[in-house]
Amino acid sequence: MRIDKTSSAFDSDLPSELLRNERSGIGSLLMLGYTPRWNASVPGDSNSAPVDVDVWKQYVDAVVRKYSAPPYNLRYFQIWNEAAGKLSGGLPQSAFWHGPNFSQDEKLSKPYERAMQDYVERIHIPAARIIRRYHAYVVYGGWPDQGGLDNFHRWLEYRSPVLKERMLDWVDYIDTHYLPVSDMETLYQQYVKNGPARGIWQTEIGNEYMKDPHYLPRYFFDFAVWALGRDWDDPNKYLSMIYHWDGYEPFRLTHPGPPERTYNVSGRSLIVLRQTAGGHLASFSKPLQCGPGVAASALLSGNDLVMQVSSSAGWQNIAIGGLQALRSRPIQADFIDAVSGEASPAGNVAVSWDNDLMNLRFKVPEHMNGADNNPPRHLAYLVVRRVTQGVT
């Protein structure tokens, strides 16, 4: 059984890529799938359940046994990808989970009535048992956004009448695709806050959403603010992964060249975010009083208070109370373009006080970095330096 190749064409050497990732400080997640055509319940369709489940289990065991051991030492394995039933977008069957009556012609395809039961009994629980046997963690197979959250709850809580077990009890990390941060709250409250799951991942975000240059920096900043208020006690408790980061479309993170790899707008925006909020993160509890036309959220990064600000053009204002301990100290505030990383001139940011209320005035340029958005907005970071001692 060959388990040493990867990529869409299976022409890349998997062991060497995993070792290269490790040397570069990059963690690796292996996705387990799909079905060999000769074992497919839908003839010739690798996105259907296996006829012989033992073949699937042999494959999973071979992969996890090899790659959870030295020198790879992988701890996370994702089972399948986007298995679901009927989708809200109108598809009667998921793109990666096919059953009887599937047709490449959407008009001829009919719903897969046993989609949930077959997935739980023939794919997920058999694989999850093997993964845990090797003391590794089970990552759910990326619930698609068009599958619907209510339906996802139903799948997670499904108890197999054959195996007498719930799928949820065989999931360590809830995993979804392309959801906004706000949609993670119900998953956290029901499955992570008090268990049984260890955390929430999104193994696909981005794609064409990245046509909006604000999408990635807003998503990751919102994600961090949200996670900091949700017992973020393990580095891998909350993760998001960008799909796909490399390509020739201008909204991908990088352009592969020739002559050399370069960063596109979305890639540069993440560099700016890392440079601006790259310190140890902590939550900031004091409310932000935003002026008209301004929306903002905040966190602490190292010694700095970092606010991500979305606003219209012109002079704008944010006030923050309860910071009287800072009044006796010199305050430096910077206004940084979230896409380019360019800092505004010193005269475009002003700090004043009204008792314990710190007022921050900043000038948003007429040429906004989200000029094509509706309505046009400018995304920036308002950073107050060396404030930690005054806000903790």
Please place each PLM-identified region on the residue numbering.
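A short acidic, amphipathic alpha-helical/loop segment
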Residues: 183-191, 318-322
